[in-house]
């Protein structure tokens, strides 16, 4: 397919071409190029070199096997790896790399590398003297750059920006580490069940402050220092990692699988020289310098934490699946033991407390009642309680002590892993006594059991269903807090304050003992409600983002299914843009724009930054919540669809809300993350216009808002669609024009024409130019009119009370796109 850059893995045998063996292209390759590692075996697999011959791109052997290869960029003289395309999916020496005549880059077989090039054809691939691999379009612009997609290495002059992530290869304990810029700081975290931060540049003693204030949004290795800039490229901080002040040297920073960042000077034609500076500088400052539950002290001297060594000789907790239950649905016997005195934990300086101003007994109870909690830390001075679902290495706290009391959860000695043989032995004497005492009692018991079985069959089947769900929840990574039903019942005052009601249940206001407020969704019924519960816990429970609503916890107890979210005082966007009376608060343009931008960032994170691509499938104003400062947070993931990174489209049953669904839902085409883009475009239009996308009370010209917006665009009068009730809207404000054009790009009928959500963010921020979109005023009415008529006959559409022209075929497409939910 034209316009898509794809690298694919295969087992297709390719015979080497002796005429081309060992000859690497210099500077760039053009369409028609092809070859395997065997073709370039005399050049160590390198088939493309930079003009200065410092860097090479080609097939590089992996550390684990000399017969498997990654498509990588290397610094030739030092053989240091700079970037890899397929680190997780190496290829064989016969797999053929092809840059075909259409400008696509392929290796026929299983897809491992994909690039959406926004409809531009590639004319060449360049390996630049900086080590940057660039796909160049026919008009000479860059389509894609390796510098924008780092793996575990950064190199001099490479911009590392907010939204990018450096990820280590897995460690021996299967842990990975990540470096990213978040909330104005650069942080290192371990990707355990719930990521735990263990280092930040803002707290680094070596940091040099060049300018107070400002928010870090990017960084680069320049000279002998790591430099940090704000959005206007003003230098805020520096981190000097070498005494070598030669600005002509090339440095790399590598995030190793031990969680440590090291620096190497690639020199000029010489072998690499490593700097003694490391991040973190403390030998005991990483999550696992010694292994879980060991204490690291001094020069990385390791010993089992004293409390655990007294309880178990092997320094292991005996817990493999903390939330697993025994065959008779009982919880495995566990206990909390003191970790001992004088120990500290790496995440305490960065993690938020689970509960504030509490006491030690309550903190223990919180951990005991939460099956995913493996350890707790309690600070006497503040009353803060910290719970962790992963415990790495401890470290000695020094003479002053850490100020924390710590406890570890371990399996009780002699629990036997939940074997039911002991229980059977206990029950057998009672059965014998009953049989001996009276046959009559046995007959009565049999009769009662039979009656219960007949009358309450669903109740008797509930444990099996509950066990199935427990297994599902147990196998989730990053599972949030599991509440008991009575705790949420108490927090909501027996569900007395109702905030709203949706398709799967009602939402109630609640307050935890520490004073933090919750919004508790109580799912009702079975079927879709059960699916929504699993989808919500599995998807949002493991991800965290400023613009995604946080799932504080859940309850799966008997027939009860509840979801506990952070409480957002301003409610949903719907109540703020669709004003029911003149006295309602009117949002100004700055607030509306920030809501639009925040929502776009949240969706971009779901689509591009999670382990699996997440398609929300139900973006609408009711599912965008607002906090005290009107920051937008995307909510309600009950209809979301997971897609692997290899999938570009997926078929699924229709889901969502009428008026916001993309055309592909109606035409039974495969959907993708671009379907969310369409829904977002509809919401953005409503946010700009302060009205619903279909309003039969309007004139025939205005009743279908998207068609009206396209018409005004063609007339050059886009300002006519802005909410007329907003006062003092600056017509010269570029954000207004960008937002309106971006909305019309998002609701294009052809999904390939719609931008990605990350591109939408760039368009709104002014980073990417927003040209006038193609006209699509009829909105595909020829495709959807028959669908609309069919749902109208079934009672799925509401008859308009407005002008008759509003019900004409020209307006059918987006009026009731999705049909009944």
Swiss-Prot record:
Residues 581-599 are annotated as: CaM-binding. It comes from the Eukaryota. Keywords: ATP-binding, Disulfide bond, EGF-like domain, Glycoprotein, Kinase, Lectin, Membrane, Nucleotide-binding, Phosphoprotein, Receptor, Serine/threonine-protein kinase, Signal, Transferase, Transmembrane, Transmembrane helix. Residues 451-821 are cytoplasmic. One of its GO terms (molecular function) is ubiquitin protein ligase binding. PROSITE patterns: BULB_LECTIN, PROTEIN_KINASE_ATP, PROTEIN_KINASE_DOM, PROTEIN_KINASE_ST. CDD domains: B_lectin, PAN_AP_plant, STKc_IRAK. ATP binds at residues 499-507, 521. Interacts with PUB9, PUB13, PUB14 and PUB29. This is G-type lectin S-receptor-like serine/threonine-protein kinase SD2-5. It comes from Arabidopsis thaliana. The gene is SD25.
């Amino acid at each position: 397919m034209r316009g898509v850059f794809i690298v694919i893995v295969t087992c297709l045998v390719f015979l080497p071409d002796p005429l081309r063996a060992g000859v690497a292209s210099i500077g760039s390759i053009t369409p028609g190029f092809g070859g395997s590692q065997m073709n370039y075996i005399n050049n160590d697999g390198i088939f493309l070199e930079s003009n200065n011959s410092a860097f090479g791109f080609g097939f590089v052997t992996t550390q684990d096997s000399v017969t498997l290869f990654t498509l990588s960029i290397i610094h030739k003289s030092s053989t240091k790896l700079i970037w890899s395309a397929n680190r997780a999916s190496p290829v064989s020496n016969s797999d053929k790399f092809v840059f075909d005549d259409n400008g696509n880059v392929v290796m026929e077989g299983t897809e491992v590398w994909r690039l959406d090039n926004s409809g531009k054809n590639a004319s060449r691939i360049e390996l630049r003297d900086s080590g940057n691999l660039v796909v160049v379009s026919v008009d000479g612009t860059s389509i894609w750059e390796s510098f924008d997609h780092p793996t575990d290495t950064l190199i001099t002059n490479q911009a590392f920006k907010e939204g990018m992530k450096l990820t280590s290869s897995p460690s021996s304990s299967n842990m990975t580490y990540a470096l990213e810029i978040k909330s104005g700081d650069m942080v290192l975290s371990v990707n355990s069940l719930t990521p735990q931060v263990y280092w930040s540049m803002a707290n680094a003693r070596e940091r040099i402050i060049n300018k107070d204030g400002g928010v870090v949004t990017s960084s680069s290795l320049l000279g002998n220092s790591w430099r940090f800039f704000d959005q206007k490229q003003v230098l805020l901080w520096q981190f000097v990692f070498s005494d070598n002040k030669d600005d002509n040297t090339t440095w790399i920073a590598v995030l190793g699988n031990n969680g440590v960042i090291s620096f190497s000077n690639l020199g000029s034609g010489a072998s690499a020289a490593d700097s003694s500076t490391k991040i973190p500088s403390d030998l005991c400052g990483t999550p696992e310098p010694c292994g879980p539950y060991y204490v690291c002290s001094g020069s990385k001297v390791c010993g089992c934490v004293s409390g655990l060594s007294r309880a178990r000789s092997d320094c292991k907790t005996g817990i493999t699946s903390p939330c697993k239950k025994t065959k008779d649905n009982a919880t495995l016997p566990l206990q909390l033991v003191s970790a001992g005195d004088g120990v500290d934990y790496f995440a305490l300086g960065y993690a938020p407390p689970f509960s504030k101003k509490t006491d030690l007994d309550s903190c223990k109870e919180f951990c005991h009642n939460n099956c995913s909690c493996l350890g707790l830390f309690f600070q006497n001075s503040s009353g803060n309680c910290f719970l962790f679902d992963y415990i790495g290495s401890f470290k000695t706290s020094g003479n002053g002590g850490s100020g924390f009391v710590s406890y570890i959860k371990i399996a009780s000695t002699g629990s036997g892993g939940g074997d039911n043989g002991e229980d059977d032995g206990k029950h057998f004497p009672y059965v014998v006594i009953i049989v001996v005492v009276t046959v009559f009692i046995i007959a009565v018991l049999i009769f009662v059991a039979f009656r219960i079985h007949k009358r309450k069959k669903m109740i008797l089947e509930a444990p099996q269903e509950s066990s199935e769900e427990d297994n599902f929840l147990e196998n989730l990574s990053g599972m949030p807090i599991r509440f008991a039903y009575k705790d949420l019942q108490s927090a909501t005052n027996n569900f007395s304050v109702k905030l709203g009601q949706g398709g799967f249940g009602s939402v109630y206001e609640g307050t935890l003992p520490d004073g933090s407020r919750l919004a508790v969704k109580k799912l009702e019924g079975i079927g879709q409600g059960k699916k929504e519960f699993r989808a919500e816990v599995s998807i949002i429970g493991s991800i965290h983002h400023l613009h995604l609503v946080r799932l504080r916890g859940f309850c799966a107890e008997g027939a009860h299914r509840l979801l506990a979210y952070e409480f957002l005082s301003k409610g949903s966007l719907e109540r703020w843009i669709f004003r029911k009376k003149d006295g309602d608060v009117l949002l100004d343009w700055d607030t509306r724009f920030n809501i639009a931008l925040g929502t776009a960032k949240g969706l971009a994170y779901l689509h591009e930054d999670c382990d699996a691509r997440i398609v929300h499938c139900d973006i609408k104003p009711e599912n965008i919540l607002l906090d005290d400062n009107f920051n937008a947070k995307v909510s309600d993931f009950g209809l979301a669809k997971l897609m692997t990174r290899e999938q570009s489209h997926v078929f699924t049953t229709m889901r969502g809300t009428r008026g916001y669904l993309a055309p592909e839902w109606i035409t039974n085409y495969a959907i993708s993350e671009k379907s969310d883009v369409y829904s977002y475009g509809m919401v953005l239009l409503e946010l700009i216009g302060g009205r619903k996308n279909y309003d039969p009370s309007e004139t025939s010209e205005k009743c279908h808002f998207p068609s009206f917006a396209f018409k005004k665009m063609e007339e050059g009068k886009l300002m006519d669609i802005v909410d007329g009730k907003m006062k003092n809207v600056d017509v010269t404000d570029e954000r207004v024009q960008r937002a309106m054009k971006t909305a019309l790009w998002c609701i294009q009928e052809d999904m390939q024409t719609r931008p990605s959500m990350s591109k939408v963010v760039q368009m709104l921020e002014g980073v990417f130019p927003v040209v006038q979109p193609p006209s699509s005023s009829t909105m595909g009415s020829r495709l959807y009119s028959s669908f609309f008529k069919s749902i109208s006959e079934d009672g799925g559409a509401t008859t308009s009370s407005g002008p008759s022209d509003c019900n004409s075929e020209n307006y059918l497409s987006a009026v009731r796109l999705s049909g009944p939910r």
